[in-house]
Every structure is written in C-alpha cells, then in structure tokens.
Regions:
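Short, ordered loop/turn segments at secondary-structure junctions
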Residues: 47, 51, 466, 485-487, ...
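Nucleotide/phosphate-binding sheet-loop regions of phosphoryl- and nucleotidyl-transfer enzymes
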Residues: 1-424, 432, 451, 457-460, ...
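Extended, non-globular alpha-helical segments
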Residues: 429-469, 520-558
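Intrinsically disordered, low-complexity regulatory segments
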Residues: 445, 508-509, 557-560, 576-578
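Glycine-rich phosphate/ribose-binding loops and adjacent secondary-structure elements
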Residues: 365-367, 451, 460, 464-475, ...
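Conserved alpha/beta-domain cores
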Residues: 99-100, 552, 562-900
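Structural motif
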Residues: 250, 443, 460-463, 481, ...
C-alpha cells in the first residue's frame, strides 16, 4: 500500500496519466492529462487516485494524509515551478482549485473549492502582485464562502432559509444600496470576508483555518467525504454507478476569470445537448468564476452569435438591446472565440463524441479546465450517434453502443396536444434547457417533492436555482422550472441527464420560499397549483395541458434498422389488446411473446359469464357459461391476430386463481345472485370456498385446466377458430398456445392432449387446418430442473421470470417492498431481482432449462416473457444463454431492441 503511486502530475504539455486511465484518475483527471498531451492549454496540477478514496474509507483520514503527504508535496512543488509562484507565499502566491472526478460523470454531485491558499496576509500579496485589490478580495470572499460551505458545513438551518452566506451578501448590498455583487467595492468585500468568518465561528464553533496546507488537506478530505454525501449516493443509485469506484481529487493552479473585463469564464458543448444539433453552443460570463455559470447564480450570455440571437428572441429582447447589453463572446472577444472554436473542434474529433467543456479566460489568455463526454437527452443521444456515423467519425457498432437503452424511453414521452396548446394560458418563457412536456403541482423543496410523489401526485419543482441538494426532488419531478441559470446551469445539465423537462432562467418569475408562492407577471400561484412546462421552447403555462403521443424521428428508425442488422435475438411484446399489439409492431416487435387471456374477462358482459362459469356447481353449468364466453374470446383473439398478421402470437391459457374473478363485496354478490337466480348466501359460500391461504401457489395455471378441462377446450377453440376466420379473410395468423405453471411433465401432457383433441375436432368441423404450436411457461424451479423431460412434448419454452424469481428466492412480489429497501441499503441485494434478472440464481435455472430442453429437442424455441425482457442487462444475459427472443411491454420494445 505504501509503495503504490497515488498522485499523477500534469502540466506544460506533459502528463503522467492518459485518457484510458479513467479507472485510476477519474474522468476529469484522465482528460486533463490527455488534453496536456494533445496541446490544449491546461493549468498545471495533479490528480490523487480513486483507490486513495477507497483507502480513505477503509483506513481513515489521518492515515491517508500520511500516505499522501510526500507525493502531494512533490507534485505541488512541480506546479509551483511551472507557475513561477509559491503556495502560501505572501509576495508571489499560488492559489489552487480542488475538484472531484469519478470515472463516470456526476455533474454537481460532489464538491469543488476554488481560490484555495488565501488568508489575511496572502490576499494582500495577491492584491499587490495583480495591482487589483478588488479582484483579490473578491477571490478571498469566494474562497471563504466555498470552503465554509464544503469543508466546514455552513448550510441553511431550515429549508425555507437562503444560503447563510447569501444572506450576509444581501444584507451588505441592502446597506450599501446596490443590487449586484459586482457593485460592491474593496471595502465591502473586506467586510464580507470578516462577516463570513464570524458567521462560520458562530454556527460551527470553529475558526476559519489560516494555514494554506491545512486548507489544502481539509479540501482534499472534503472531496473524498463528498463521495458519500446523500446526493452523490442517490445519483449513483439512479445511474447504476458502484460505490467502490471512488472519486479522484484533482488539484490545479487557479486561473482567474474575475480579473476584469478581459477575463471571463464559461461552459460550452460541441453539439446541442438538448436536441443533438451539430451546433457549437455555450454560455459565458465576463469578470466571473466558473461556479457562477454552473450554479446558475447569474444568468449568463451566449458564446456564439447565432445562439445569442436565438436566446434574445426567446427572451423578447431586441437586436439593438442584445448587441449593447448581452453580446456574444463571438462579438465581444473575437480572437478568444476563434481559439475556443478551434479547440472544441479538436477535442470532439479526438474523443469522437460530443464534448462538454469548461474554460476560463484570464486577462486575454484562454485556459481549458475540463472536457468530458457531455450528458444529453435521449433525442440528442440518437441524433448525435447517427450524425457522427454519417460524418464518418464512428462506425455502425459504435453508434449502437453510444446509445443507452434506457434513455430511448425519453423519445417515447408524450408531448403537448397542439389543440390544447391553442387555448392554454402562457405565463412566461424561459430557456428550453431540456425538452419534453411536463404537468404537475408546484412544489418548492426536494423533500416535499419526494413525499408528494410517494403519495401518487405529479409535481413540478419550482426553484430560484437548483443545487445538488435538490437532486432527490428533481429525480421524482415531472419537470423543473428555475428563475435563474442558463442552458449550462446545474438544473439544465442534470435535467438533461435524467431526461427531465426543464425550463431555466425564467427571469419573470419571483419565487417566495417562505410563503410558498411564485409570482409570474402578476399571476400568483401557490404550492399545489398546477403548472405546465414545455422544455422544447421554454414556455410556461398555467394549469394542466393535455398530451399526445410523440412522433419519432428518422434517426430513431435508422438506429432501429442498425440494431436489426447486428442482433440475432428477436424482440416480441407482451400485449393483450389490438392497440398494444399495433404500438409494439410500430416499434419493431416481431410477434407477441405473452398474450394474457385473463385480462379479456374483465369487461362488464364478459365478467358476468366468467363468474357464472366459476360459481356453477356442475359441468353442465360451466359449459353453458363457457359457451357465452366463447364468442367474446374469439373476437378478442381476432383483433390481436389481425394486428400481428404474419407474426407469432403466444397465447397463455387462463392463469390466475379463480377467486380474482368473483365479487367479494356485498353489492357485487347480490347482483351476481340475481343474475344467476340463486340466493346471496349461496354466492357468499361459493366465493369463500374459492379463497386460498397462498393463492399464487394454489389452484391456478395448468392446475385449473386439468381440474376444469372445459376451460382449456373453450380457449383453444376461441384461439383457433379466430385464426380460421382470419385465414379465410386473407390474413396469416401464427398461433402458439401456452400452458402456464407447468411443474410436472404429466401436467403438461394432460393439457396438450385436451388442446390437440379440441383442435382436431374444430378442424374437422370447419374443413380447415391451422398450424399451431403448444408450449409451456417455465416459471417453477422444478420445471427448469426437469426441462429435458418436458421438452419431449413441449414445442417451445417461455420463461416467466417474474414467478420464477418469486419461487426461486421465496420472495413475494407483493410483499417484497417491506424489506427490499433494507436489503439494498445493507447490500444484501445489489438490485431489485424483480427489476433486474438474478443471473447467478434464476439465470442459471434459465440456462439449465435451455440446455436440457435442447438436448432432446434441438429446434426448441426459447424466450422470456417477464418484464425482465425489457431490462438491458437482462436482455444481454438472454442473448448470452441462447434464447431466441425476449418479450416486454410495447413501450420497452425499442429499449430491448437496442440492448439486444
């Protein structure tokens, strides 16, 4: 452990790291090293490895400091030499930034500290060195504010309170009679530093550290601590980032965007992160530091002239006003803009992906502080991948791999109805930070959003600006609206990464946290009122607006065609209605992997006949009721087979226990008694007789069919007679009849005999034959263990992984919520096994059944029909074990196709 290299230096075109060292140096550290190596101007610095973060939690803070001390001091000396200044020196001071950097991008989730190394003596030296006392004290007050928050824990006491430092700033500005931070003079900034330190001492009981090395170690440890803060943990859960990855810490020489009118800071993207358009775009602020842009504290200006004009149009600002008061960087700093544009092109070509970059201009010199593959919306993800393919920057397989299956879901989100929009009341407009349509009730705080969401309410978070502490609320909100911040603010970047609708920088809104109201151009809305956001054009509307299905782009279709070219795993859908079948077919499904017949029985007329069949006390009574059901079932099947013309439709025979279909309330029992001409008491007794202690392991599935063969006969006749009618109409139906819940070969044999006998009788009556297959669901562990025997009769297997998971783990799907959070928290389980297939247990049963089944029937078709069929990692496992297809709900078909 002691001999392990933990610190990697970079600067002046040299670096000890490379882009492929993300695991060791995190994304930020690896890319800073790489930028040095390809000639991009980057301030010198060093990166502490992710392994050190893990050691920090294993062996403790002081032990890690002792391990790091020698390497950090050596690396710091290298930075001092390159910058020709000295850390902590009162005449020629070097200031540092300390930033986090995990191997996967986690924007805003961990902590950053700027201007580190200042104290009352060093700040005077900085003022003399730069000849700019205002800049020096502005840097000092920013450092005390940031360090006090991140390292010393200065937070608002109550959620309604504003940041304690901002409260001090507001008070000083009020006393001075000014509105903007940059209107404060040197004496005001000195006063802020003093008041900040007093507030820290009062709230934390600790004095602000004056020793620069003590500050540095405090900052490094604070970044390691931030790996385990609540928002970082939540973000990792959302993104599937393992805790054991850890974060790196990057320490860099400070360059300053707040040294006057020739200095600036900004964030830019090589392509539009919201739409995917091939347009360089970004935001900048003159005389500011990077956190001002990202945190949304000030609404910045646009980098490009085109972007600036588009922004002004959205804000209702005239071209004359824009030129004078809101010029683009392209206009205000043309030479710096040219350099920036050249380097962003170079970086995108080098990484062959859309880049998200941070930069600072210090007195006319451009420095890059970061580049990373940019977070993007689902729509942008698809467009960027297909554009890069067309531009020859990536190949077809790379284009497929660049698209995250779960983000395709965003493309399928509804949009506002054009008809409904025509009569909607527009309140204001902001920046279209993340596209989509969102309707919900206004909430102002993250914890309220989470609580309301848990109660089943749709919410829209309204904030002055968001911070990483708001992540839990943003995660459950339908959309986010902010008064401040631009297209690169925290709200915008995180919302795009989550696929959430977001409107930012809506300057006309006035948010009052204390009274929980928001005023928008004279209209007052309170917490709980409905609001609608259009993240595509930045419009904000009062009330709820009706939505409709989104239209899919040509790039989406092209991506799906690529997927079909490179996969051998077919994707079917789980569908019980013609509409669902049509939707799935539009998304590329090549059949139905699960058609549940029980859902067809719950219409008003059908349920009466179904209940008559269940409650009948003899075979004749059941046959009479089933005769009523037959035409209904037949028509239902005709609609589904018609929608899936030419593709296989796998129909599962009746599966649920019968008690699910009978009335359990007095009124329903009275109506049933009247319809059947029997007493209420008779109905009550029959209903009670159907109740079971453990119905999911009771009288259901093939056990029903074997107890009441007439049910199987009716359903077989309905399926095949529907197909005969369609064949006569010129359609090409492909029926598959599936016996559910088989555990013993003889259960299946008995049902197969009934099915084939009924089919033979029907074909003789009609003078027409239909080719069909009979298979079974493998959802009982015993069926997997004896799959070779079952395959001697079954023509295909469909794995019902929902029930197979339930019976393998012994977990009830309906009751797991009572202990699952504890199991996930304690890492007893890594994921919910009903969401992600358990490959080591349930998955091995699937593999065993496939291998055993094909050992006796080499053409055995195998598929999966649980909702695992639409979960990307589960789909990949299905491909690995040799399944022929996966089946999932219609709107997850594109996700499964991409994952396959």
């Amino acid at each position: 452990m002691e001999n392990q290299k933990r610190v990697y230096s970079f600067g002046a075109g040299k670096a000890e790291g490379r882009a492929d060292m993300r695991n060791e140096l995190g994304g930020k550290g690896a890319n800073l090293a790489e930028m040095n190596l390809i000639g991009v101007p980057v301030p010198p610095g060093f990166t502490i490895t992710t392994d050190t973060c893990n050691d920090y939690y294993k062996i403790g803070k002081q032990e890690v400091i002792d391990l790091l001390r020698g390497e950090v001091e050596k690396a710091l000396k290298s930075v001092e030499d390159l910058m020709a200044s000295k850390f902590g020196d009162v005449e020629n001071p070097l200031l540092l930034s300390v930033r986090s950097g995990a191997r996967a991008s986690m924007p805003g989730m961990m902590d950053t500290i700027l201007n580190l190394g200042l104290n009352d003596e060093v700040v005077e030296g900085l003022a003399r060195k730069t000849g700019n006392p205002r800049f020096a004290y502005d840097a000092y007050r920013r450092f005390v504010q940031m360090y006090g928050d991140v390292v010393m824990g200065m937070k608002p006491v109550n959620k309604e309170d504003i940041d304690p430092f901002e409260a001090v700033i507001d008070k000083v500005k009020e006393e001075k009679g000014v509105k903007l931070d940059n209107e404060l003079d040197v004496e005001d900034l000195k006063k802020l530093v003093r008041l900040f330190k007093e507030a820290i001492q009062q709230q934390t009981g600790k004095a602000f550290p004056t020793n620069p090395m003590e500050q540095l170690w405090g900052a490094i440890c604070a970044v390691f601590d931030s790996w385990m803060n609540e928002r970082a943990i939540l973000y990792r859960k959302m993104e599937g980032i393992p805790a054991e990855w850890g974060t790196a810490v990057t320490v860099m020489a400070m360059v300053f965007g707040n040294m006057g009118e020739t200095s600036a800071t900004g964030v830019c993207f090589s392509r539009d992160a919201a739409t995917g358009e091939d347009l360089f775009n970004g935001e900048w602020l003159v005389n500011a530091q990077g956190e001002d842009v990202v945190a949304g504290i000030r609404t910045p200006q646009q980098i490009t002239l085109e972007g600036s004009r588009r922004w002004a149009e959205l804000q209702g600002i005239s071209e004359e006003d824009r030129k004078v008061n809101y010029p683009s960087m392209e206009e205000a700093m043309p030479e710096i803009y040219r350099q920036l544009d050249t380097i962003q092109t170079k970086l995108e070509e080098h990484y062959r992906d859309m880049q998200d970059m941070e930069f600072t201009v210090q007195e006319g010199k451009l420095w890059f502080l970061q580049t990373r593959n940019g977070k993007r919306t689902g729509a942008a993800m698809v467009k960027i991948a297909m554009d890069l393919l067309r531009q020859g920057m990536i190949d077809e397989k790379t284009a497929i791999n660049r698209c995250e299956p779960n983000k395709l879901d965003e493309l399928l989100h509804p949009v506002f109805s054009k008809e409904a929009l025509s009569s909607a009341k527009e309140l204001t407009r902001g920046l279209p930070a993340s596209p989509g349509a969102a309707c919900g009730q206004i909430v102002f705080f993250a914890e309220d959003a989470a609580k309301w969401h848990a109660d089943g309410r749709k919410v829209v978070m309204v904030r002055i600006e968001t911070s990483p502490e708001d992540l839990a609320g943003m995660a459950v909100a339908e959309g986010i609206l902010t008064a401040r911040g631009g297209m690169t603010s925290h709200a915008a970047v995180v919302a795009r990464g989550m696929g959430k609708c977001c409107v930012s920088g809506a300057g006309a809104i006035n948010v009052d946290y204390k009274n929980r109201i928001v005023e928008i151009d004279g209209v007052v809305l309170k917490e709980g009122d409905y609001i609608s956001l259009n993240g595509t054009n930045g419009c904000v509307y009062k009330g709820e607006i009706r939505t409709e299905a989104a239209e899919l782009s040509g790039d989406f279709a092209a991506l799906m065609d690529l997927c079909a070219k490179y996969t051998h795993l077919q994707v079917r859908t789980n569908a019980d209605t013609p509409h669902d079948a049509e939707v799935a077919r539009k998304f590329g499904a090549v059949g139905i992997g699960l058609c549940r017949t029980e859902h067809m029985f719950f219409d008003k007329e059908k349920i009466v006949a179904m209940r008559e069949m269940i409650l009948a006390d003899d075979v004749e009574g059941r046959r009479k009721a089933l005769a009523k059901l037959l035409p209904y079932q037949k028509e239902d099947f005709k609609g589904i087979f018609r929608a899936m013309d030419g593709y296989p439709v796998n129909v599962r025979l009746l599966d649920p226990p019968l008690h699910e279909f009978v009335p359990h309330d007095i009124k329903g029992q009275e109506e049933m008694a009247q319809a059947m001409g029997v007493t209420v008491e008779y109905i009550r007794q029959r209903v009670e007789s159907l109740c079971e202690h453990n119905p999911m392991l009771g009288h259901r599935g093939c056990r029903l069919g074997n107890t009441y063969p007439c049910i199987t006969q009716m359903q077989t006749r309905a399926i095949l007679s529907a197909c005969i009618d369609l064949k006569r109409e010129g359609f090409d139906p492909h029926p598959e009849i599936m016996v559910p819940l088989t555990g013993i070969l003889y259960e299946f044999e008995a049902q197969e005999e009934v099915i084939r006998a009924e089919a033979a009788e029907l074909f003789k009556e009609e003078g027409v034959e239909i080719f069909f297959k009979v298979g079974t669901m493998i959802e009982i562990p015993r069926a997997a263990l004896t799959a070779d025997r079952i395959a001697t009769h079954a023509e295909y297997f469909s794995f019902g992984t929902n029930d197979l998971t339930q019976m393998t783990f012994g977990y009830s799907r309906d009751d797991i919520a009572s202990f699952l959070p504890v199991y996930l928290e304690k890492k007893i389980l890594k994921v919910d096994p009903f969401q992600v297939l358990d490959q080591n247990g349930v998955g091995q049963l699937v593999k065993m059944a496939v291998d055993k089944g094909r050992s006796v029937r080499n053409d055995l078709k195998c598929g999966i029909c649980g909702e695992h069929g639409g979960e990307p990692s589960s789909v990949k496992f299905c491909h690995h074990v040799g399944l022929n297809y996966v089946s999932c709900s219609p709107f997850r078909v594109p996700i499964a196709r991409l994952a396959a």
